[in-house]
Amino acid sequence: MDHLKRQDEKVFAAIEAELGRQRSKIELIASENFVSEAVMEAQGSVLTNKYAEGYPGKRYYGGCEHVDVVEDIARDRVKEIFGAEHVNVQPHSGAQANMAVYFTILEQGDTVLGMNLSHGGHLTHGSPVNFSGVQYNFVEYGVDAESHRINYDDVLAKAKEHKPKLIVAGASAYPRVIDFKRFREIADEVGAYLMVDMAHIAGLVAAGLHPNPVPHAHFVTTTTHKTLRGPRGGMILCEEQFAKQIDKSIFPGIQGGPLMHVIAAKAVAFGEALQDDFKTYAQNIINNANRLAEGLQKEGLTLVSGGTDNHLILIDVRNLEITGKVAEHVLDEVGITVNKNTIPFETASPFVTSGVRIGTAAVTSRGFGLEEMDEIASLIAYTLKNHENEAALEEARKRVEALTSKFPMYTDL
């Protein structure tokens, strides 16, 4: 970044500081990952200069012959990975992908069944502070009070009672496998559309390690980062019968020109997901998550649902007599990055919370394995149990530094 360093020292310094943070801390935020240098090169390419409103072969600007190739590559690779009939890779985010689906099939005020945010859902699944909860009549389903798993009989009962036009499956903080086939059966029984938001598990689905929602859902949305390990962005997969409507909802419906440099980075990441070693990577994510969950439980920590089937773990910190906010802060102080998170049947404010959400996608990309998961479990428990003991926190910092120093990253940057 020699040009940036010479031209804008302040921005360069901030980027360098962030690189230092990523190198020196243990990244456990479940929605984050580390992309390859190839993905970063594509996103930082000259494609950032190109406007390309429309779709390949049907643009509103000239000079799009090369970006058309890039977008076609991205779409074709997604079809190959997930078996989708139609793909739109233009959404700037998962939220905009969800918005486009809603705009395609819903009218303002229509009833939708979605997962309660504190039970593991997402803001765009009907939260009253989000456009989805403002524009549509969302009815919530959740998890069982004891098992903390989705109660499909309850979902069916609510679907029969409220007759939603759309059912939304998928989550942002649910550590268990979701039965998409069952969701489709419920949707069919009440004559509803089914949309699956697989943002968190897309990489696991791509590797064949989590059930694929594409054969069951009318629409599948996802981000392109998280476990899929691409750039930050979104996409929509749908049945061919909805292709024209979905494309129209994205452009000109809710977006203008697509970000072609990001789509190029998406294409590169999708190519990586098609390689044999990506399945090994995804399996390691799951193995690491299971080992980390076991280690946390051995340390006496409480896990929502008692464990995990994917990359994500939700820790209930109430038995430690602290809040999620305190836990996030003290872990960050020693070099472990997490996020506070609500838990099912939450009683605390979303700005405080009773839980912490962690995930293993990023540390697995860095090369951490089972032994490192044991050390991380020990570190988390040690830090939280000694959150007011500065000597203990200093010891934890040294242990974090010793661990991260064994796994250098982005050494060419």
Curated annotation (Swiss-Prot):
Transmembrane segments: none annotated. It comes from Bacillus cereus (strain Q1). The modification N6-(pyridoxal phosphate)lysine is found at residue 226. This is Serine hydroxymethyltransferase. Catalyzes the reversible interconversion of serine and glycine with tetrahydrofolate (THF) serving as the one-carbon carrier. This reaction serves as the major source of one-carbon groups required for the biosynthesis of purines, thymidylate, methionine, and other important biomolecules. Also exhibits THF-independent aldolase activity toward beta-hydroxyamino acids, producing glycine and aldehydes, via a retro-aldol mechanism. Keywords: Amino-acid biosynthesis, Cytoplasm, One-carbon metabolism, Pyridoxal phosphate, Transferase. Its main location: cytoplasm. The lineage of its organism: Bacteria, Bacillati, Bacillota, Bacilli, Bacillales. Belongs to the SHMT family. The record marks 225 as: Plays an important role in substrate specificity. GO terms for cellular component: cytosol.
